[in-house]
A protein has these predicted regions:
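Electrostatic cytochrome c docking/interface patches
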Residues: 10-36
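Short, non-ligating residues that shape and space the ligands of small metal-coordination modules
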Residues: 50-51, 100
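Electron-transfer interface patches adjacent to heme c in soluble/periplasmic c-type cytochromes
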Residues: 63-78, 94-103
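Sequence/structural segment immediately N-terminal to covalent heme-attachment motifs in c-type
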Residues: 26-50, 80-86
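C-terminal capping alpha-helices of c-type cytochrome domains
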Residues: 8-9, 81-89, 95-118
Length: 118
């Protein structure tokens, strides 16, 4: 899914950058984020969030690498949420597939990939 070429220069709308995640990264939120990621993101973004999922080689654009702390730290939660919501080929939009809550919680979870590299 996701998420994101954000880490590769995909810019969100200015107002999206200011959005705040209403779901703190609690153990319950992260567990919900893991479920969403596993079901919708992992095939492209990979088990470890490194953009090396089983479908990655088939895509015209490499999936975002969420393990790159430098790039991930430059993105706001609002930008990641926006990119997940609206997508950009080949990544699908998830506005009608996932609830707002699910999209925010997957943002919480993908943040853990870069955090584990510090």
């Amino acid at each position: 899914m996701l998420l994101i070429w954000a880490v590769q220069g995909w810019s969100a709308l200015a107002k999206a950058r200011k959005l705040k995640n209403p779901f703190p990264a609690t153990p319950a939120a992260l567990a919900a984020g893991i479920e969403v990621y596993t079901n919708h993101c992992r095939r492209c973004h990979g088990q470890y969030g490194d953009g090396r999922g089983e479908k990655a080689a088939e895509l015209s654009v490499a999936p975002g690498d969420f393990t790159n702390a430098s790039k991930m730290n430059r993105l706001t939660d609002g930008e990641l949420y926006w990119q997940t919501t609206y997508g950009r080929r080949p990544m699908p939009a998830f506005a009608h597939k996932l609830s707002d809550e699910q999209r925010w919680k997957v943002v919480d979870y993908i943040r853990t990939f870069a955090a584990s590299k510090r």
